[in-house]
Amino acid sequence: MKKRLDVLLVERGLATSREKAKAMIMAGEVLVDNEREDKAGSMFPEEVEIVLKGKPLPYVSRGGLKLEKAMKNFNLTLDGKVCMDVGASTGGFTDCMLQNGAVKVYSVDVGHGQLDWKLRNDPRVVCMERTNIRYVVTEDIEERPSFVSIDVSFISLTKVLLPVRNLMEENGEIAALIKPQFEAGREKVGKKGVVSDPAVHKEVIEMVISYAKSISFGVRHLEFSPIKGPEGNIEYLVHLVRLPDGVTEEETNVDVDAVVKSAHDTLDK
């Protein structure tokens, strides 16, 4: 009898969930009969030899690797902080926050049943599933977060940043993913929802940055995500700081052109 590769990984105890198994497979960490296999849905006999290579994924999903890069490159410190993970899904960002000292994480997602069981049972995690961040108010949470990550799909960041700002502590920080496929006009999105034109990437990044500045966020850093999105889209990480109401910073020190070029040079090989 044949089974999916991600199912076999979970059954053998090589992965804690199918989502984590998929992340490991996509990261090239799984060898089947000494051959690298990158499709989670590939079917194999139950007795097939499966070997993991390299160091195991440290988070419940590969999303944690995105926040890990943001923390290193943006000099973020989460020790002792209350945080919020918007678009939590399986909880890769939440897991990364906890492993870096967060004392509490509000894990917010419009879906349900996705958050990894380990995190769902962690007393430091408040699972806010079936929850649209656009309608969350301060009365829904016990403390204002001082750090928020945003990883949302099928919606522009410009629809999410203001509701998040209204929940945050003064001087709170954000690490948000800019996803060109959900920011660009429909006519600029290619087959399978892929946006590959660097000029469009630059355009949507500048649009998001301009909007963030208009609602009193300071823009501190910009980097490209270390891994592509599910369909192969390059994504970007932006570091924002909540300024006092009505305060705007005209200048930013981020070089959008350089970051976009570096992203394509690195990830399009």
PLM regions: where:
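Flexible, glycine-/basic-rich loop-and-beta segments that form/coincide
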Residues: I234-K269
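A basic, amphipathic helix-loop patch mediating RNA/tRNA/ribosome contacts
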Residues: M1-V48, V82-C83
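Glycine-rich helix-loop-beta junction characteristic of Rossmann-like nucleotide cofactor-binding loops
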Residues: L14, K72-D79, E139-E142
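A short glycine-rich, Lys/Arg-flanked "PGG" loop and its adjoining helix->strand segment in the class I
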Residues: T158-A175
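Conserved class I S-adenosyl-L-methionine
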Residues: D79-S89
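Short, glycine-/aromatic-enriched active-site segment of Class I SAM-dependent methyltransferases
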Residues: P180-S196
